[in-house]
Each structure stands twice: as C-alpha cells, then as structure tokens.
Amino acid sequence: MGYSSAFKLCTIDEQSAFNGCKLMSVVATVDDYLHEAGALDKAMLPLGFFLAFCAHHRLLSQEFTRQRAEQLSAVRRQEGQVTTLFAAHGATLYASDFTPQGLVFVRGYLPQLYADFAQTFEPACFEIDDDWSNYQQLANVMIRHLLGQPRPAHTSRGLWSTIKTRVAMLWR
C-alpha cells in the first residue's frame, strides 16, 4: 500500500528572527495535504483530527488554550465538526501551540500521521466524514504513539493459581 512520496513535513525549529522580529515556527499546515486530498476541506482532516487529539490529551500550550477557549470547549463536548478548531486557528500548526510534552509528541508522531491516517481509512481516506466517530478511529491509533503500546494483561492463570493456593490453604 504505497503512500504518496509527495507528502512533506515541515521541520520544527526553534523560533527564529527576521529583522529583529520573532517568527513563529510552522510545524504543519493544511497545504501539506492539499495535493493528496484534492480539496481544502478534505485536506484539513488529518491535522484537524491531530489537533483535536492534542486538545483531549492536554498537549496544547496555555496561550493556545486561552486564545481558542470557545473552540476547545466544543472539542471537549465533541460538538460540530472535528476540524473546526484547526480551521479557526488558520489551518496551520506552530511550535508555540504545544506544551513541551506536546512538542515531543509532535516531533515523534507527525511524520507518521499521514501513513496512519491513510491506513486507518483506506482506500479513500480523504473521502471520510469530518465527524467524531472517524476521529475516534484515528485517536485509537494515535494514543498508542502517545502512551506506547499496551502492555499485555496479566493472565488470569496467575490470579487463578493464587486463588486456588489460598483456598487450598484454608481447607487444610
């Protein structure tokens, strides 16, 4: 299942200066997905879902949270379209939008986002609806990258063995 090699990711740099003014470092933009998606509203899906995920997991900076309080409230209630927050923010993500932990996640996961998005919603990933049920499917993938793979649960055999041993001791 080959993915387009045309997709490129903006690297995250520290803020730089131009003529003495600080420039915000762009992390990703809707333009990164526009060619593959074919339409602006569809190109917003991967990063819109990603930004909603970051909001749900408190990976956004205090400044971002303060500036987008109204849209974040709708995200927490899962109201409206998932990409509304991303659209309201100008369809561009900046390094300053994230907490330090958020930036670590962004640096580690954003290069993988397109592949996970395409694999989760194949064959026509950009034809999905902008809704919370689709968001949840991708969020289930993203959480593994944020928290790591789930650890295997302790087998009930170990617990059962402990119970049998204790019951046997009581009968003696």
Map each language-model feature to its residues.
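Glycine-rich, aromatic-bearing surface loops/beta-hairpins
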Residues: 155-172
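N-terminal low-complexity, intrinsically disordered segments
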Residues: 2-14, 18-80
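Intrinsically disordered or highly flexible coil/loop and linker segments, enriched in small
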Residues: 59-63, 95, 99, 152
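Amphipathic protein-protein interaction modules
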Residues: 76-146
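Compositionally biased, intrinsically disordered low-complexity regions
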Residues: 5, 14-20, 99, 112, ...
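Polar/charged low-complexity regulatory segments
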Residues: 28-30, 35-37, 54, 134-150
